[in-house]
């Protein structure tokens, strides 16, 4: 899966660079090269499994260097998220178990409303989005994972431990970009850790019954199956 997206982003970069030989305007060529660098960098990030490409800090912010150098991709990420919110008409988050919430990256009003009346622990699995300022509290943990990829086993273990350490005392919100893949994988891992006899497919169905939009790819399912073997 990583290689697939690496190839796609690299091909887009190659097409943009090829366009430099077609357009005559120097400004258009410069723009093509600028956007191509963004896509090529993202392609390499997927090829070598490097979420640090986005330069997301532990406190949930993204460096100014990343925002400037990869502005076309940041803009594309936000456009994709806002378009998905508008078209899918899905609730931003769902309570899977008491105090355990699974959802997408919240926009400002949603985040303020969710965190307003009670203490919240936030597990942020996005590498490509800065966390909303309302959710970057003292109980915040960022485990940056590239979109459409699976958490490593040590990341799953860390995520499960974070959820377990907070769930008895406060609401825990686990999210990725859309709340369908990376975050669903982590929530499933926590559920599997609580019931060591439950099979992966049953846990996925349990989550899907509450948040129908989830969908784990083959890499994410493989990570869960390996997690079950090691638990």
Predicted feature residues:
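Glycine-centered secondary-structure boundary/capping sites
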Residues: 36, 118, 178-180, 195
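A phosphate-binding catalytic loop at a beta-strand-loop-alpha-helix junction
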Residues: 170-188
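Generic detector of intrinsically disordered, low-complexity, polar/charged segments
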Residues: 3, 15-16, 38-40, 100, ...
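Cysteine-based protein phosphatase catalytic domain of the PTP/DSP
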Residues: 78-172, 190-228
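N-terminal membrane-anchoring alpha-helices
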Residues: 1-85
